[in-house]
Amino acid sequence: MTIISDSQIVVALISALVTGILALRLGRELYR
């Protein structure tokens, strides 16, 4: 089991937020 550092958690959260926002934008564009 590997120890996850705070920086890795922050990077994962930011990447998840970015991908979520991009997915929402893509969904809205396709919905139109």
Curated annotation (Swiss-Prot):
<protein>
    <recommendedName>
        <fullName>Photosystem I reaction center subunit XII</fullName>
    </recommendedName>
</protein>
<dbReference type="GO" id="GO:0009535">
    <property type="term" value="C:chloroplast thylakoid membrane"/>
</dbReference>
<keyword id="KW-0603">Photosystem I</keyword>
<keyword id="KW-0602">Photosynthesis</keyword>
<dbReference type="Pfam" id="PF07465">
    <property type="entry name" value="PsaM"/>
</dbReference>
<dbReference type="InterPro" id="IPR010010">
    <property type="entry name" value="PSI_PsaM"/>
</dbReference>
<keyword id="KW-0150">Chloroplast</keyword>
<keyword id="KW-0793">Thylakoid</keyword>
<keyword id="KW-1133">Transmembrane helix</keyword>
<dbReference type="InterPro" id="IPR037279">
    <property type="entry name" value="PSI_PsaM_sf"/>
</dbReference>
<feature type="transmembrane region" description="Helical">
    <location>
        <begin position="10"/>
        <end position="27"/>
    </location>
</feature>
<comment type="similarity">
    <text>Belongs to the PsaM family.</text>
</comment>
<keyword id="KW-0472">Membrane</keyword>
<keyword id="KW-0812">Transmembrane</keyword>
<keyword id="KW-0934">Plastid</keyword>
<dbReference type="GO" id="GO:0009522">
    <property type="term" value="C:photosystem I"/>
</dbReference>
<dbReference type="GO" id="GO:0015979">
    <property type="term" value="P:photosynthesis"/>
</dbReference>
